[in-house]
């Protein structure tokens, strides 16, 4: 059955794309950032209501973690993630694959899937394409990611090739299982979408061939996975540029796990629509805050008596109400409020960076914006 997803390309400047992505939970203006709420909340004490207040469009939750705790069946009994978290916008759930390959211990990979030990208590779990789709059906997310093998970088070409082929076979099983779950009325969200994931490590030939194969499956969207895992930034950009011509023009494109503001600007420049990253919240929890002039460490002594907001150009609750000096004090005193305000600020910055990118694309001035800010925003000041 052909995909009914409505990604609409509104405008293009070179390879950069301005678009809309319509889902059952609302329309996403793209390019867009997905805010990582691993266990259904942003680390640092932010709720779904906070995400609404900072202008977020999409929330991303973690299939692996929610399967382990509180359990996807409990979430289904509570009406799905939207009712459980009180977030009514689009939610993307990852497949669990990345966590299985990065967190879990003693894993064993077969054609059927992966057997691994929980990082919480060590109990044995099996997850394959069907199990991942069943868990995500219980979660009821707007977008489910296909279950894929995440290969460590660097990797051998032969193993990477075999892994891509297995990921394609798993993708076909994901598609079939999602169709079954919908047909039998099992999915919490009968309009759940499926995204496939391009793999191939840093081998351009594997990346391109794999993208050609999965593009033929007519999925709702396509992601580039397995990057931003230690390879040089220039290599990541090159992989995006190599794959982009083979990504369907009428489908949304998602770069997984990326990244810094500069990374995002560069990837938009290369034709990517959708992003996610733990970086803004993780950095904020350590006092590293994004501004339009670069990155500041709010714990530095030079901010002890600084009466200015974190960023005078920012409209977030932290910048509207508090000084750098006060937020620095909260960090030094180890008050939870300091972390919460910092996380709120960085996520506001990321979401409004995307809004600024969309405005520049609308105006036809994105290339000039790219040239001005791509290095500046990642500079530590």
Q: Where is each model-derived feature located?
A:
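Glycine- and acidic
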Residues: 153-156, 161, 221-227, 336-339
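Glycine-rich phosphate/ribose-binding loops and adjacent secondary-structure elements
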Residues: 165, 177, 181-183, 189-310
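Structural signal for hydrophobic packing residues in well-ordered secondary-structure cores
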Residues: 140, 171, 175-178, 182, ...
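A non-catalytic, amphipathic alpha-helix used as a structural packing/dimerization or gating element
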Residues: 131, 135, 162-173, 209, ...
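Short acidic/polar active-site loop segments enriched in Thr and Asp
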Residues: 57, 142, 220, 273, ...
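C-terminal extensions of enzymes
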Residues: 1-20, 28-37, 44-45, 148-154, ...
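Conserved, mostly hydrophobic/aromatic
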Residues: 26, 59, 94, 136, ...
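Non-catalytic, usually N-terminal nucleic-acid engagement modules in DNA/RNA processing proteins
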Residues: 1-188, 301-304
